[in-house]
């Protein structure tokens, strides 16, 4: 109610739909921003296709939800730490995704194929131009980057590096309650 970070989620049909699903489920929205985003991600990863009557049988669909979330965290933090950047050059994104999959023994997926499947499945990451991608909303990148920094015990390092940059306020807002 009146939270600008939540209000910005109403700017796109996909994100507005997620808020409506959350509200319909509980007849209210979570008070904590991190809880709202956690639920929205859960809905996208677990319920989005099912609610629309889809069942996909792809390599991406066979990845565990935890692996998917860890991949999003890794990509969000990688690109955030480089500037921070909310737009990802396609070639670099494909390369990072492929190396992440190899490093963690995930099914033999190419980075390009995996990102395209993510885009088709639920749109957490989407094409933003002919040769670049981004998270469907900057706040998703902030949320996943914050989760990465906290789970890897790098939140203090991030705060020391970026504390004076306004563009980092969103990540910091997510780090505090995590």
Model-derived features: where do they sit?
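Catalytic-loop motifs flanking and including active-site residues across diverse enzymes
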Residues: 15, 71, 140-141, 167, ...
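Extended helical regulatory/linker subdomains that flank P-loop NTPase cores
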Residues: 24-26, 30, 42-143, 150-153
């Amino acid at each position: 109610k009146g939270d600008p970070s939540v209000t910005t989620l109403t700017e796109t049909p996909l994100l507005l739909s997620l808020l409506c699903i959350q509200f319909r489920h509980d007849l209210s929205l979570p008070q904590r921003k991190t809880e709202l985003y956690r639920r929205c991600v859960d809905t996208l990863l677990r319920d989005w296709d099912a609610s629309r009557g889809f069942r996909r049988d792809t390599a991406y669909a066979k990845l565990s939800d935890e692996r998917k979330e860890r991949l999003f965290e890794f990509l969000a933090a990688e690109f955030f730490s480089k500037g921070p950047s909310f737009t990802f050059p396609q070639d670099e994104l494909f390369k990072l995704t492929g190396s992440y999959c190899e490093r963690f023994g995930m099914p033999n997926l190419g980075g390009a194929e995996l990102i395209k499947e993510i885009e088709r499945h639920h749109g957490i990451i989407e094409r933003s131009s002919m040769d670049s991608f981004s998270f469907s909303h900057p706040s998703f990148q902030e949320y996943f980057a914050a989760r990465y920094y906290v789970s890897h015990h790098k939140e203090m390092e991030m705060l020391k590096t970026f504390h004076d940059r306004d563009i980092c306020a969103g990540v910091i807002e997510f780090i505090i309650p995590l």
